[in-house]
Amino acid sequence: MYPFIRMAKERVVNRSKQSISVGEIHESYHICWPWDLDFWFELNNGRALTLYDLGRIPFSGRSGFSKVILKNKWSMTMAGANVRYRKRLRAFERIRMQTRTVCWDKRFLYIEQSMWNTKKECAGHIVYRAAFVGADGIINPQRIFDEIEKNLLSPIMLSLIHISE
């Protein structure tokens, strides 16, 4: 079952935060609960993807994506992901998550997310390839960025994806 209570918490916590620009980091905090664990008593890989959702959805609101998507009756879908699990996250461990826009091309937006444990080690990292979709199919992300901020161009795609502390 999708964690609706956690989503409600994220909406309440983030509704009064100021908006962020492209490339700025949205930071959120989560806890690894016992029901998030697998047989080895660490964060289940599938639940980790759900936690990334919980970081990405408020990010979409703060960055202006949600407003443009709702106004135009579009949607945003994840078209691919490259994930790395680096360190174990155990029960009741506090997780700091960072989310940011990396770049975009004519079809996709690339979003980077990372999870950090209490020792300030990167516990997990993912890069999503997201598509904005309308009635006629995939929408060029530049249209979304033009509505958020005029004349905004994508950063250079190569060598931008990194983990920062």
Predicted regions and their residues:
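Short aromatic-glycine-enriched beta-strand elements
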Residues: 108-112
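Core beta-strand residues in small-molecule sensory/regulatory alpha/beta domains
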Residues: 114-117
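Early exported N-terminus immediately downstream of N-terminal targeting peptides
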Residues: 28-35, 45-57
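Conserved small/polar residues in nucleotide/adenosyl-binding loops
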Residues: 161-165
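N-terminal leader/capping segments at the start of a protein or of a new domain
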Residues: 1-39
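Residue-level signal for glycine
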Residues: 120-124
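Hydrophobic beta-strand-centered segment that forms part of the acyl-chain substrate-binding groove
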Residues: 59-103, 125-131
